[in-house]
Amino acid sequence: MKALLYSGLLALALAACTTKPEAPKTDLYQEITASDARYDSSLATRLKADEYGMHQYVLAYLKSGPNRSQDSVEAAALQKAHLENIARMAESGKLVLAGPFLDEGEVRGIYIFDVPTVEEARALTETDPAIQAGRLIMELHPWYGSAALPLLTPLHNRLEKKSITN
């Protein structure tokens, strides 16, 4: 019995000695930027980047609207429909960023649209059930930002464990 115990311990000790140690984890920013990144004209063209790597978008501030008197059931239904509308616009590629502000101020959240005009962004915001119900209003502005923003949605999808629309 002792021989069996010693044999088992010896096998574990040998396995521990031969197992490769886990590689140290690198900082994600370093990992992403460590490559010999140079200007990529093909990527710049696909993302509609100008010579500075920038692109024009439309920024929308979602503000509290004049009609916030819905009961909790109706407010929850509007919020669900609002989130489903966000998902639909993101899937179309026209909405590249969306999110709420975490305070209780008048400005409730933002959208960044990848559309050429404020008018097109306005038409998209008018599809939102919360806008239609007057629970939210939009303030729209042309905005100039990184042309890489459309890459956020596919990257986010790799991080999202649970969907906001479920």
Where are these regions (language model features)?
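Sec-dependent signal peptide recognition
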Residues: 2-8
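C-terminal motif of bacterial Sec signal peptides marking the signal peptidase cleavage site
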Residues: 14-16
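Conserved, structured core segments of small domains
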Residues: 18-166
